[in-house]
Structures are given as C-alpha cells and as structure tokens.
C-alpha cells in the first residue's frame, strides 16, 4: 500500500473527533501529508492532489496552521497551476509567496518563493526577469539543509533552482554559463539519493536542455533511462515526462508515422494527468515532425492548436518558434506563400527580440536571410545575423549557431 493510500483513511477518521482547533490542526497536517505523498505517485495537477491542497488552504485561511504549512500549501497550489499551464493563476500565487516569505527570516522559504516566481516568469517569456529572480533564489541556497528538506518540499528546491536558471541562461544566449550550471546539476545529482528529486532534476536539468538544443540522440538515451528509473522508484509523474521526451526525441530523429503516433499518444497521456506545461514546445515539435513527413495540413492544424493554447494558458516562452514554424508551413504548402512566410518570420523575430530570446531570434533571422533576396551577398546576411551572434556566448556545437555562421560566410547554400 502506498503512502497516499495510508493517509487518505486517516483524513476521513478525523471527522469522528470533537470540533475544535486540535482537530483542525491534525486535519491540516494529514491533508498536507496526503498531498505530499500524491505528488510523485499521481502528479501535481490531478484532482486528488488539488483536493488535498485546497482542503489544507481552507483550514489555513481559518487561522489554523504554521508559517511552514502556509508556504507548503501555497507552493503546492502554485506548482499545480504551473504544471497545468495556468500561468496567470500560478503567477498570482507565486507573488503571494514572495510577499509572505519576504516578511519571514527564513532563507529556505524565500528560495522556494523566488524559485516559483522565476519558473513562471520563464514560461511566460520573461527570461531576463526570470534569471534575476532565480539568482535571488540561489542566493538563499544552502545545499546541505535543502537536500534534507527534499521530503518535505517534494523535491530538493535548491537543486531545482539551478535547473530553471540553466533554462533562462540558454534562452538569453548565455550558453557557456548554462553549460557550467548543467555540469553542477549533474554533479549534485550523483550523490543525492532522493528519487523524486533525481527524476525531476534529471528531466529538467539534463533532458529538457537536450530537447531545446536539438540533441535528440542524447535525449533519447537519457529519456529511456529516466523512464526505467521512474518505473523502479514509482515516480509516476516523471515517468510520463520521460515517455513524452522519449517520443519527442524519436520523432526528431525519425519523423515516421509510427513515431508521430507514439508522440501524440504521449502528449495525450500527459494531458490525462492535468499536465500541460511545455505544450507549446511539444506542439511545435509535433508540427515539425509532420512537416518532415509531408503532412503540411496537419502541421498547420497543430500550430493553430498551439496558438490557441498560448492564448489560453499565457505560456509564451516558445511563441517565437511557433511563428517561425508557421513561416515554414507557408513555404512548404502546395502553393508557397512567400509574403505570408516573411510576415511569420518577422513576427518570430520581433517576438524573440522583445523576449531577449537570442537563439529564437537567431533562428528567425536565419529564415529571413534565406528567404529575403536569394541573391543577397554575404555582407547583407552578416548585417542581419552578426549582431545576434555577437551576443550569444558559446554554442559552437549547436546546429542553429553553426548554420547562422555559415550563412554569414557564404558557406551555407540557400536552397530555392
């Protein structure tokens, strides 16, 4: 019997006790224990987890409970909305957490609240603000103390900060710094010993950056390892995340109908738990795979759904790439729409520039350089691409950076 199955009956038995603060205090503790047990077993956004957190919040709002219990409940509710890609709700709770913990004299509380805020800022496309917020969180980090708190917080919150900081650095083009943080995450994971933390930070600190960098072979290998680990350790939520990243990587490597079907199935399985975080990326990857097998209409429909998701969720971090892929669809359709493609690439470029998403900006600029005047000189392309390349630190192993550099030197051929 799982811990969650043990706690639930105890919550029900509380109602046989006499009314009063002692009963409410016990009930609050049991709801929190129930929610904490459900996180690795069921996921962050399932109805059972949310019900336990909401019940705990109602007791807290009646005046019962400690500061620690309040921050744990707020953190759980913020994470549930964040994983469900309800970014406005997650942001509101994260700001409540920051306001609350700024009045406390506890670095662990402050780290938890600033980490929550920084992760929401990242997925809403506020990369610079996210990095600043996550650096504030990191300043509160005590690796030994927070490692011991992994069981109370669900995962090691300090190590999670490093993962989110890594993402923000990648988007801002600080690739050498991001590589150093990635190595730090891997080093700390080796001796951690807390399965939910190992699963979570392997996905977010190793696999996610590989996906974003297009390192499909490494991602496939590490995702398969994560799925096996999560099955052994019963970390259900990240077994699903690993299955999703595995299917995504395989569709990148070989966009066959079979791999695309498996990818769609993995997305549906994730949605069944209430998790939608990262959907804009996965829809974009699915559209790219569909383009790879000539399913242009299906790719266009997938992108349409992705834009609707962005509008509904507030998840804007991959918006520039959705516009870029829209341009590619317009170029690939039976009657290529050059003007429509240019408009889409410009939207991608402008969106990425506003977000300071340097790699997205570079990809959009590369498409514009290819599309523009097919007789453009290397000098013309340098004027477009070099200012972006100049602010990207490192990345020589990345295909998008290599292709842009090749375009500026006239080495990469523009195919009509």
Place the predicted regions along the sequence by residue:
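Core catalytic ATP-binding domain of two-component histidine kinases
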Residues: 230, 275-279, 283-285, 294
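Acidic, glycine-rich loop-and-beta core segments that form the ion-binding/anion-interacting portion
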Residues: 194-267
